[in-house]
Structures are given as structure tokens and as C-alpha cells.
């Protein structure tokens, strides 16, 4: 038992460093894409939104297949291959002077994520015990926030010189991450049985409760991805400089590093996962409604702060809830499918957000996209409430019988 505990402990440290590299490499590049192509080159927000949505759709929409392959062949080969593929996508992005090149680069980056993301998520479940999983997710989120602000700072600084440097730096970090995994990651099996890929896929698709939960989260992700598209654009417009975007990520990092872990420990003793997820989503939704009417940068940052507070409350609960519903016989497949809501929400959030932003500008109604996003948040909240309430009723009926 002592050896098992030691292996779990070392595995968690490995996951934390690996996660830092992945987050850093991603945020060096992606927050700057909308600034580079919309603000600097004058491309339509819809064109850039399509590129970002394509990356999201490819990575998360095909995640169930990446997870099923990892269930069959193990985590290590999929993680290393996927990270090298993302590095290639970032290198191609440096040459993007036509929309189709940007779309191709984002698709290649997303395909890499399809391969490495589900097995990495499944390893978290494998190496953590259920009672500590929520707090470990909080640590990962704190690291995500710190990596995001450091990555955005590096990317903003490099963008002053050349966008090529931004992309090459992101690619180099993912090559480093691939080497780290190839050298040190043991040949873990992420599921308790090594079943054919089709069996893992069908096991997930037959789990109606899990499928409903994942698809309901589409609306949640439509709100969440605006951190990468519309919020940076609005911050840049009000500030008059892309350098101000880094302060948006600095707010997230400061809130996450100071509040995320203690808030997770406090709330897990007092509220259910479902209550924490819905409360966080409600805060995120209400904070988006007024953004289109804001004319001062300080006020905008205040509402972005509220948005992040909602995310800090909701995210650990969302991850832990999804992990608790996963079948240990097909962890990779479950974690891959769990990203489908992010795929749909990301694709709709990016493309729809870009279209709504352009339409709002054309109609001289800057509040339009934010109002529509708020409505989507309320509809999602109602869907989650119905789903969780029905589950409680079914559990009560089973226990009484």
C-alpha cells in the first residue's frame, strides 16, 4: 500500500508539471489570435471565430475516439503524438496569411488535443482518490490560471515584435512537453479492462444520464469560451491597446490563486456538486448581460471579475461531477465524450459569438451578443436544474421502494 501511495503521489506531481507546460504553451498563442487577426490585420471576427471554433470542435468533438484509442493502447503514445501534432499546428499558424491556412493550423492543433487530452484527464482519475479529486482539480485550475496569465504575458510581449515568435514559442513548449512525457511517463493503462474500442464507445453512448449531462453543458461552454474571443476584443477596444488583455488574465490568476482552493474546500463541506455548478453558472450569466453597455475599462474589469468568480465556483464541481459519473472500465472513452459539450459549446460560442459581435457592430447594438449569451446561460441553468431535480426524484423513488 505504501508503494501504491508513493506512486500516486509521484504521478500527481508529474501531472502538475505536465499541465503547466500544456497550459503555458496554449496561452502563449491562443489569446493573441483574435488580437492579431481581427484588430491588427482587420479580418472579420466571424472568420477568426470559425478558426477558433474549428479547433474546439475537432479537439473536443473527436475526443471520444481519442479516448477510446487510449483505452486500447495506453496513454503514453497518444499523449506524445498529440503534443507533437499541436506543435506542428502552431508552427503552421505562423505562416497564416489566408483564412484557410489559419483554419488548417487550428484544425491540426485541435487534432493534437484530441489525442492527448482524454488520456491526460483519465490519468487524473486513475491517480487520485475520489475524496481528494475535487481539491486536485482545484489545484489544476489554479495552475491553469497562473499559466494563462504567464502565457498571455509572454505572448503579448512577443507580439510587439512579430506574431511568428508567438507561434514558434508555443510550438517549442509543446515539443518540450512531448519530450517530458516520452522520457518520464510510465506506460499506464488508464482503464481497468483493455476492451475493444467499439465496446468503450458503446458503453458511454448507452449511459443516458452521462450523455444528458454532457450535452446540457453546451450552453455553459458557449459562455466560457468568450474569454478567448469577445472579452479580449472588448478589452482591447476600451483600452486602445492589446497589452491590456494581459490584465484580464492577471485578474483570473489573482482570483484563482487566492480563492480557488480554499473556496473548493469550504463549499464541498456545505453544498452539493450540483448546487456549486448551478450557482457558478448563474454568476457567470448575470455578469455578461451588462458588458455591451460598459464604456469604462475599470467597470469592464469588475464584471470580468464576477465572471471569473462564477467560473471558479463552477469548474471544480463540473469536473468532479463528470468524473464521478464515469465508468472505470472505459475511463478514456468517458473523458473523451465528456468533451463533446465543450466541442459543441466552443464551436457555437466562437462562430456564433463572432457572428453576433459583427452583427451587433453593424446594427450599432454592442449589447446584442452579450444579451443573447445571457439568455443562453439562463436556458442552460434551467436544463441543469431539471436534470438534477429529476435525478433526486428517481433516487428517492428507488430508496423508498
UniProtKB/Swiss-Prot annotation:
Domain of life: Bacteria
Record's bilayer topology term: Multi-pass membrane protein
Disulfide bond is among the record's keywords: no
Pfam families documented for this protein: MFS_1
Keyword Cell membrane: yes
GO cellular component, one term: plasma membrane
Segments crossing the lipid bilayer: 13-33, 34-54, 99-116, 139-159, 165-185, 214-234, 243-263, 277-297, 299-319, 340-360, 368-388
Record's signal peptide: none
Subcellular localization: Cell inner membrane
Listed InterPro entries: MFS, MFS_dom, MFS_trans_sf, MFS_Transporters, Multidrug-R_MdtH
Molecular-function GO terms, alphabetical: transmembrane transporter activity
Keyword annotations: Cell inner membrane, Cell membrane, Membrane, Transmembrane, Transmembrane helix, Transport
Family: Belongs to the major facilitator superfamily. DHA1 family. MdtH (TC 2.A.1.2.21) subfamily.
Protein's UniProt name: Multidrug resistance protein MdtH
Organism field: Yersinia pestis
Lineage: Bacteria, Pseudomonadati, Pseudomonadota, Gammaproteobacteria, Enterobacterales
Amino acid at each position: 500500500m505504501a508503494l501504491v501511495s508513493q506512486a500516486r503521489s509521484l504521478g500527481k506531481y508529474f501531472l502538475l508539471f505536465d499541465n503547466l507546460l500544456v497550459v503555458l504553451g496554449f496561452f502563449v498563442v491562443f489569446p493573441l489570435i483574435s488580437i492579431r487577426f481581427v484588430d491588427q490585420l482587420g479580418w472579420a471576427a466571424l472568420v477568426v471565430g470559425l478558426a477558433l471554433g474549428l479547433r474546439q470542435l475537432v479537439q473536443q468533438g473527436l475526443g471520444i475516439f481519442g479516448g477510446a484509442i487510449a483505452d486500447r493502447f495506453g496513454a503514453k503514445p497518444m499523449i506524445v503524438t498529440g503534443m507533437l501534432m499541436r506543435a506542428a499546428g502552431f508552427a503552421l499558424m505562423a505562416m497564416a496569411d489566408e483564412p484557410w491556412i489559419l483554419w488548417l493550423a487550428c484544425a491540426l492543433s485541435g487534432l493534437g488535443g484530441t489525442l492527448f487530452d482524454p488520456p491526460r484527464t483519465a490519468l487524473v482519475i486513475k491517480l487520485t482518490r475520489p475524496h481528494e479529486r475535487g481539491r486536485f482539480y482545484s489545484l489544476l485550475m489554479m495552475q491553469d490560471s497562473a499559466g494563462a496569465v504567464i502565457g498571455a504575458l509572454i505572448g503579448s510581449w512577443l507580439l510587439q515584435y512579430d506574431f511568428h515568435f508567438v507561434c514558434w514559442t508555443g510550438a517549442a513548449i509543446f515539443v518540450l512537453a512531448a519530450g517530458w512525457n516520452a522520457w518520464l511517463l510510465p506506460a499506464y493503462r488508464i482503464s481497468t479492462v483493455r476492451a475493444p474500442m467499439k465496446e468503450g464507445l458503446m458503453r458511454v453512448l448507452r449511459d443516458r444520464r452521462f450523455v444528458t449531462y454532457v450535452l446540457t453543458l453546451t450552453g455553459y461552454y458557449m459562455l466560457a469560451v468568450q474569454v478567448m474571443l469577445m472579452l479580449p476584443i472588448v478589452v482591447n477596444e476600451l483600452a486602445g491597446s492589446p497589452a491590456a488583455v494581459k490584465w484580464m488574465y492577471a485578474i483570473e490568476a489573482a482570483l484563482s490563486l487566492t480563492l480557488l482552493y480554499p473556496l473548493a474546500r469550504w463549499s464541498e463541506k456545505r453544498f452539493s456538486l450540483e448546487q456549486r455548478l448551478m450557482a457558478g453558472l448563474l454568476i457567470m450569466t448575470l455578469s455578461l448581460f451588462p458588458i455591451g453597455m460598459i464604456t469604462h475599462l475599470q467597470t469592464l474589469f469588475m464584471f470580468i471579475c464576477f465572471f471569473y468568480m462564477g467560473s471558479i465556483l463552477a469548474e471544480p464541481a463540473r469536473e468532479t461531477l463528470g468524473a464521478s459519473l464515469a465508468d472505470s472500465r472505459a475511463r478514456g472513452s468517458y473523458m473523451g465524450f465528456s468533451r463533446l459539450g465543450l466541442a459543441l459549446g466552443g464551436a457555437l460560442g466562437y462562430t456564433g459569438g463572432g457572428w453576433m459581435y459583427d452583427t451587433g457592430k453593424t446594427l450599432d447594438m454592442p449589447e446584442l451578443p452579450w444579451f443573447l449569451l445571457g439568455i443562453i446561460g439562463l436556458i442552460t441553468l434551467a436544463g441543469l436544474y431539471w436534470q438534477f431535480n429529476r435525478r433526486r426524484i428517481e433516487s428517492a423513488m428507488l430508496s423508498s421502494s
